[in-house]
From Swiss-Prot:
Zn(2+) binds at residues 77, 94, 101. Binds 1 Mg(2+) ion per subunit. This is Phosphoribosyl-AMP cyclohydrolase. The lineage of its organism: Bacteria, Pseudomonadati, Pseudomonadota, Gammaproteobacteria, Candidatus Pseudothioglobaceae. GO terms for cellular component: cytoplasm. Its EC number is 3.5.4.19. Mg(2+) binds at residues 76, 78, 80. It comes from Ruthia magnifica subsp. Calyptogena magnifica. Pathway: Amino-acid biosynthesis; L-histidine biosynthesis; L-histidine from 5-phospho-alpha-D-ribose 1-diphosphate: step 3/9.
């Protein structure tokens, strides 16, 4: 696959992936991908990441049902960052039950929660 050959993975064979809601433009999350997860994402048109903590592929929504259907894939000018524009199934991207993982905003010198939990994580990951 030419796209994989042109993509610049780091010394750990990883590349950062920014995930954006296709309809609203909201940034939903950040994750890591390796060559296998990027190839699977392209093939299946559904987001697959690489979990650094578990050291294995992470099929987004596998447990929660909150899958990410790929609408567009971009890379930056250096081919070392991926942008996935997705349809977020269920409207929840974050394991905390929020739409986005970016729900804390700097307010003076403290982080302030600015987005509500849409669904209790206990109800998502039973």
């Amino acid at each position: 696959m030419d796209a994989l050959k042109q993509t610049k993975f780091d010394d750990k064979n990883l590349i950062p992936a920014i995930v954006q809601d296709f309809k609203t433009g909201d940034i939903l999350m950040f994750a890591w991908m390796n060559q296998e997860s990027l190839a699977l994402t392209i093939e299946k048109q559904q987001a697959v990441y690489y979990s650094r903590s578990r050291k294995k592929l992470w099929f987004k929504g596998e447990q929660s049902g909150h899958t990410q259907l790929i609408k567009e894939i971009f890379t930056d000018c250096d081919n070392d960052v991926i942008l996935l524009r997705v349809d977020q199934v269920g409207g929840i991207a974050c394991h905390t039950g929020r739409k986005s993982c970016f729900f804390q905003q700097l307010d003076k010198n403290n982080w302030k929660t600015v987005a509500n939990v849409l669904k209790n994580p206990k109800d998502i990951y039973e």
